[in-house]
Amino acid sequence: MIVIDLFSGAGGLSEGFHKHDFKIAAHVEKEYWACETIKTRLFYHFLKAQNDLELYHEYLRVSDNYRNIEQSRAFVFQRYPELREKLEMEVLNRKFGNPHNDPTATSSTQMIQLIQNSLQYSRATSVDLIIGGPPCQAYSLVGRSRMKDSVGKDSRNYLFQYYKRIVDEFKPKAFVFENVPGILTAKQGKVYQEIKESFDQIGYTVLSGTSQEDRSNVIDFADFGVPQRRKRVILFGFQKKLNYEYPNFERHKLSWNSPLTTRDVISDLPVLKPKQGHDLRLFEYDTTQGVDQLSPYELMMREDSIGFTNHFARPIKERDAEIYQIAIEHATQGRQIKYNELPERLKTHKNEKAFLDRFKVHWWDIIPHTVVAHISKDGHYNIHPDIEQCRSLTVREAARIQGFPDNYKFEGPRTAQYTQVGNAVPPLMSGIIARAVKDVINGHH
């Protein structure tokens, strides 16, 4: 089945689809480093298919500086020259928009041409599925209080017009994308109504879940075996004449013997103090650690892997270190520290209400809470549970919570890595979505 992946980010959604035999002909993403991450992931999938993961591991060993990423890749291209064209054709580092107002943008007409070139390269004559959708940050509930004045004029709101144009052009059987719950409630539900009506005009039905009552279609990924509380909406659209049903994710959920906790997810990763570790260098696994000491989840994350990258603990200010210790002590007693409970000398914000939950620990014995892109700005909402380490999560720890396997390398400077991880659809969830969507499409042959 041929897929186009729009607004790909670091490839979290397409990873699950790739795993279940969908062929992703094109990834469209505006962020440069997210595209480089997707390219590295395509290296991995290509070399795995060639039965040459040794070469991928070699790449992980040598590529320890994002500034000379091209040099690091040279020896892979030397062995497989065809890879260079594959990456060029399948990863489109482009931004949707109007080139008249934004010189960095690509018009929808040009974007359609580029995607057509990608399809030709893949020898695809039609598109079965479009995955990924416009990031409606402007409608995110978290963002809504901060963006009170700008919600109406945020140009990102118009992205779905571009998205619709692509759907209309390639006429896939279906499209699927993940979004924040706010998309259903924005402007008293008018925004979602508008989305449905505008797809109706081009012959598509859009469903937000199995319930007639849209707002009850919010799902928590934790209920599907993903080790994270993450509430999202999965929108599924299809050609009216196909009359599909909404995919049954429940049927494919992951079952663990007991609910996953932070301990199951990150406790095998090396202990780091702030400023220790490496952004890009490969950590090989500690072979003295017996397999019997690893959780089933940790074993799953280590499949096809000799180690992991992106494990650097960011530096921390003295004041924050003190707050983290207090927060971890609270967590030990099963409590979350509230900002107004901090000693006066540690407070820096006058508006205590807005920052009430500013500091949050991923406690050992409970399921991790949602990881979002804000983790690129500071780690206060993602504090490591070990008081000895007294730091925020590394990119790799956040990636574990998001369900990215250890051999998934995030390229670029650390801030870009954190953003990529925080914005991603967890690959474990996208695998569930892929299987359920496949059932729907195949059931209607």
UniProtKB/Swiss-Prot annotation:
Subcellular location: Cytoplasm
Enzyme Commission code(s) on record: 2.1.1.37
A GO term, aspect molecular function: DNA binding
Keyword entries, A-Z: Antiviral defense, Cytoplasm, Methyltransferase, Restriction system, S-adenosyl-L-methionine, Transferase
UniProt entry tagged with the keyword S-adenosyl-L-methionine: yes
Superkingdom, natural source: Bacteria
Catalysed reactions listed for this entry: a 2'-deoxycytidine in DNA + S-adenosyl-L-methionine = a 5-methyl-2'-deoxycytidine in DNA + S-adenosyl-L-homocysteine + H(+)
Keyword Cytoplasm belongs to the record: yes
Catalytic site positions: C136
One cellular component (GO) term of this entry: cytoplasm
InterPro entries cross-referenced by the UniProt entry: C5-Methyltransferase, C5_DNA_meth_AS, C5_MeTfrase, C5_meth_CS, SAM-dependent_MTases_sf
Top enzyme class: transferase
Summary of the knockout phenotype: Cannot be deleted in a DISARM-containing strain of B.subtilis.
Residue intervals of the SAM-dependent MTase C5-type domain: 1-444
Xref: Gene3D superfamilies: DNA Methylase, subunit A, domain 2 (3.90.120.10), Vaccinia Virus protein VP39 (3.40.50.150)
GO biological process: defense response to virus; DNA restriction-modification system; methylation; negative regulation of gene expression via chromosomal CpG island methylation
Pfam families: DNA_methylase (PF00145)
PANTHER family: CYTOSINE-SPECIFIC METHYLTRANSFERASE, DNA (CYTOSINE-5)-METHYLTRANSFERASE 1
Entry similarity comment: Belongs to the class I-like SAM-binding methyltransferase superfamily. C5-methyltransferase family.
Function as written in the Swiss-Prot or TrEMBL entry: Component of antiviral defense system DISARM (defense island system associated with restriction-modification), composed of DrmE, DrmA, DrmB, DrmC and DrmMII. DISARM is probably a multi-gene restriction module, this subunit is a DNA methylase. Expression of DISARM in B.subtilis (strain BEST7003) confers resistance to phages Nf, phi29, phi105, phi3T, SPO1, SPR and SPP1. Protection is over 10(7)-fold against phi3T, 10(4)-10(5)-fold against Nf, phi29, phi105 and SPR, 100-fold against SPO1 and 10-fold against SPP1.
Name this polypeptide is given: Type II methyltransferase M.Bpa9945I
Organism encoding this protein: Bacillus paralicheniformis (strain ATCC 9945a / NCIMB 11709 / CD-2)
Organism placement in taxonomy: Bacteria, Bacillati, Bacillota, Bacilli, Bacillales
Encoding gene, per UniProt annotation: drmMII
